[in-house]
Amino acid sequence: GSTKNILKGERVALNILQRMSGVATLTNEFVQKLNGSKTKLLDTRKTTPSLRILEKYAVTCGGGYNHRFNLSDGIMLKDNHISACGGIKNAVSLIRKKTSFVRKIEVETETLDMVKEALEVKADIIMLDNMDLDTAKKAVSIIGNKAQIEFSGNVSLETIKSIAEIGVGFISVGALTHS
């Protein structure tokens, strides 16, 4: 192409490349903190508009894993869904009636009572959302191997190792792609 056209796109291309490099580097810093652990680092859907596929690719380049690309990739019942349905049992019951048995259902929990309710309805994945470490430790003990466990909320480079040590399978970090 012409020099003029190349120069027009140069800054945009460099900005995108720098952003993705930053995402991959930050992801790798988190992954290094998990070294020796079986816990996997996940991204979230909190991405820059129009850059989701690139940011999620950058996460994998940094050694992390993608959680979901979009809402259709998995069923995650968040606090507002649970409230609207009148509780976890009702929410999961409604979902099971409307979806294939092969779809995994993830339930966001904030308390030990919610964890127990998610276990009663046989949630496939239980997210411990914004729990303090002591409560999360108790939740992991209650869940055992009855469901996969994801920790989310207030995760930093300083806290990720201690979170992994309580036995969660996954830790999701929105800050990887959402600054």
For each feature predicted by the language model, list its residue ranges.
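Acidic/glycine-rich phosphate/pyrophosphate-binding loops and surrounding catalytic core
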Residues: G1-V121, I125, D134-I142, Q148-E150, ...
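Short secondary-structure boundary segments
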Residues: N130, G153, A175
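Cys/His-rich Zn2+-binding cysteine-cluster or related metal-binding knuckle/ribbon modules and their
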Residues: L157
